[in-house]
């Protein structure tokens, strides 16, 4: 989808350096966090006793001060701080991603960065299913 991390890397390759995007906050409102490896649902039961930050090497306020278990608790009791911290984290992740894209473009190492990022980034099951349906519909269209 538009505005997702993998897509940002692709448009960065085309020289796009600035754009508006509501995805980080929209996804946060659905209790989901972006990471360098894909998305995670903070409300999922497996986070109930996960005392780690959303992403270990993230320097955002949410990751430096809150665990997934505590964020999950905040979301489950409808405390607005939970959604705010997910928005902070997701926005930070996107800014960091764009910073890395610019850095690698400037250093001439973007192709390697893009390859490594895409190889390590796993989209959600929903995205994978949408891609499969899209590929099937394109195959059907081309065979007619």
Residue ranges and their predicted role:
Residues 1-54:
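Glycine-rich phosphate/ribose-binding loops and adjacent secondary-structure elements
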């Amino acid at each position: 989808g538009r505005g997702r991390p993998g897509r940002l890397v692709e448009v960065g390759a085309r020289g796009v350096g600035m754009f508006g995007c509501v995805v980080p906050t929209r996804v946060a409102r659905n209790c989901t966090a972006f990471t360098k490896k894909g998305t995670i649902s903070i409300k999922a039961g497996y986070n109930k006793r996960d005392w780690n930050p959303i992403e270990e090497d993230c320097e955002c306020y949410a990751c430096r001060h809150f665990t997934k278990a505590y964020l999950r608790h905040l979301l489950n009791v409808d405390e607005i701080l939970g959604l705010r911290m997910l928005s902070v984290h997701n926005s930070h992740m996107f800014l960091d991603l764009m910073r890395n894209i610019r850095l690698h473009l400037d250093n001439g190492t973007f192709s390697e960065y893009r390859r490594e990022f895409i190889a390590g980034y796993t989209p959600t099951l929903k995205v994978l299913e949408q891609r499969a349906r899209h590929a099937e519909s394109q195959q059907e269209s081309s065979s007619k």
